[in-house]
Amino acid sequence: MENEGVAKVERYRSGGTISGVVGMAAVVLLLGWGLVSNNDGMAPWAFPALVLGGVLVWAILLRPSIALHRDELELRNVLHTRFVPFARITAFRIDQMTVVEVDGKRYVGSGFGRSRLTINRDAKVGPDAPSDRHSVGWLVEEKVRRRMRPHDAVAEPGQVRREWAWAEIGALAVLALATLVTLLVA
């Protein structure tokens, strides 16, 4: 899909979005209540602990996803992201989690999956049924399988890369330490 000359990235995630938004809203409300209440407010250690909880909600419920780029699959997990070129993928499936195999190695994406019930429904419908009868997971599987075929037999596909989520890792470390220090000092 092209949009004004730029390839559109298709991003998919499982059902943690609503829980994540509710969790983040709860963190913001509790922080606001703690800031506006005078003497009966929260303990000093509760502030960094709440922000730590917010970062955990973000990292566990909102960050994980999979994305289909033009030439590669992005598996975004809690603390790292893998970029897998479509031409290198030897096997791909979406069960409870997304599983990608490349040269005998398995890479798992926790951001998108299907329930057993959905997997069984997709199997009963069959591959020749109209696309509106299948789940989103089945449709994503088919999109990836179509892209797995090498586009250019001459060009060497890129390597599988991992990028750490340094912002989340740093925030978790600093906030855990701040919570511990304020708990011990206060």
Over which residues does each language-model region extend?
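Short, basic, glycine/proline-bearing loop/turn elements
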Residues: 40-42, 47, 72
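N-terminal membrane-targeting/pre-transmembrane regions
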Residues: 1-39, 142-186
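Conserved beta-hairpin
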Residues: 53-94
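Single-pass alpha-helical transmembrane signal-anchor segments
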Residues: 28-29, 46-61, 175-177
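A membrane-cytosol interface segment of integral membrane proteins
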Residues: 106-158
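Acidic, Ser/Thr-rich low-complexity segments on the non-lumenal side of membrane proteins
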Residues: 84-115
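Short, compositionally biased leader-like segments
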Residues: 36, 40-41, 67-69
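Short leucine-rich amphipathic alpha-helices used at interfaces
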Residues: 43-45, 60, 66, 110
